[in-house]
Amino acid sequence: MTTLAFSYAVNLLSRREYSEFEIRCKMQEKAFSEQEIEDTLAQLQQKNWQSDKRFTENYLRARAQRGYGVNRIKQELRQLKGILPETVDEALMECDIDWSEIALNVLAKKFPDYRARQDAKNKQKIWRYMLSHGFFAEDFADFIGNGTEDEFY
């Protein structure tokens, strides 16, 4: 492992958490050899300076605070950040996030008059928005009326 590769990775981590996949991609862009990348990642993980588990927990909290649901966050972690499904599931089980409360906050912010929107067209719009932001129907269906998901598709 070269000190240049290690310094580059430490510099990245000094600004924010990165997943192993993200560091690997950034180091490949800088044309470090695979051996340098492997050695650097091993040393970072040995010193506990890089941890996919810690990254996942922080990312989960940050995205939930920004108004995204479980499905969206899981997809981002797996596809964009290269986190293993087991790590994502473990972090979700350990977190104490009230997804229904987040769904209600998102609903109230995006659709302040959602209680008055009782026609089918407006309910469909709300359903599409909430589902596209990664919320399960159970997290928000009670807030927008007695309809079921099947009625809106």
From Swiss-Prot:
Q: Where in the cell is it found?
A: Cytoplasm
Entry superkingdom = Bacteria
**Which gene name does the record give?**
recX
Q: Which GO terms describe its biological process?
A: regulation of DNA repair
**Function, in words:** Modulates RecA activity.
Print the keywords alphabetically.
Cytoplasm
The species is Mannheimia succiniciproducens (strain KCTC 0769BP / MBEL55E)
UniProt xrefs under InterPro entries = RecX_HTH_1st, RecX_HTH_2nd, RecX_HTH_3rd, Regulatory_RecX, WH-like_DNA-bd_sf
Tell me what this protein is called. Regulatory protein RecX
